[in-house]
Amino acid sequence: ERKEAIRGAYRMTGGNSFYDGMITCSTLSGKAVCRLVWAMNKAENDAYLEKAMSGIPEHFSGKLLEVPVGTGILTMPVYQTMPEADITCLDYSPDMMRQAREKADRLHLKNVTFRQGDVGALPYEDDTFDIVLSLNGFHAFPDKEAAYREVFRVLRPGGTFCGCFYVMGEHKRTDWFVRHVYEKAGFFTPPYETVSSLKARLDGMYTDVDMGNLKSMAWFICRKAKEEAMICQRKQPSFRKKK
C-alpha cells in the first residue's frame, strides 16, 4: 500500500541529519542536492520557506496545526518564539515525528503536542484551528483530494491555510528527479499540482489568496471565508493528469 511505502521511506530519513541538511540547504551535501535537484541556492531555499511561513503572525497566540511536521527542523525554532500559541504537530511517520519531538524537548517547548495521524482523516472537530501550516507535504500525500478537504474542514472560518510544496512543469530537471528518483523511493506521490491548477484550486476554496513560486516550489497563504457554505458550493478543479 502506498501509505506504508511512504512511511517506510521516511523511516529511513527520520533520524538522518542528511535530511535536515537537505531541507534547510545548510550542509555541504544538502546544498549539493538543492542545487542539483531544485536548482536553488540557500538564499532561494530560505526565501520560499519564509514566504510560506509568513502567514503566521508575529506573537501568534491561537491554535495551529502543522501537518506534516516531518523532523521539525523548519518549525521548532519558530515555535520557540510563540510561547502563547497552542500548537499541534501531526505526521503519518512515527520516526519523523520522534525527531521533531526530540527537537521540541531540546528547546523546552511546552506548548507543542504531537500526534500520529493521516491528513486524509484528521482526528479533529470541524473549525478547530486558526492556522493550518503544511510545509513540503502535499506532494507526498497519496490522497490529496482528501487532504485538501480535511484541511478546509478543521480550519475555522476566517482562519489561514499556508505552506509550500512541489509543483510540476516549472523546471525540467526537477521534474525528472521527482519522477525517476523521489517517486520510486516513496517520498513523492503523483498526481501533482501545476502553478495554474494550484491557483485555481485555492481561489475556488479560499479568499485573500496570496501565492507564488520559486522554480518548482510553490508557496501560498490563503484565508477561509466566513461564509464557507458559499465557497464549498463551488466546483473544485481536478488534478491535471501526468502524461
Regions found by a protein language model. Name each.
Residues 1-60, 77, 179-182:
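Conserved class I S-adenosyl-L-methionine
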Residues 13, 29, 36-38, 162-220:
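C-terminal alpha-helical "lid/dimerization" subdomain adjacent to the S-adenosyl-L-methionine
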Residues 63, 158-160:
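Short glycine-centered segments of the SAM/dcSAM-binding site in methyltransferase folds
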Residues 63-121:
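Class I SAM-dependent methyltransferase SAM/SAH-binding core
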Residues 120-131:
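A short acidic, Gly/Pro-enriched loop at the edge of an enzyme's catalytic core
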Residues 131-143:
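A short SAM/SAH-binding and catalytic strip from SAM-dependent methyltransferases
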Residues 145-157:
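A short glycine-rich, Lys/Arg-flanked "PGG" loop and its adjoining helix->strand segment in the class I
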Residues 204-243:
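Core SAM-dependent methyltransferase catalytic element
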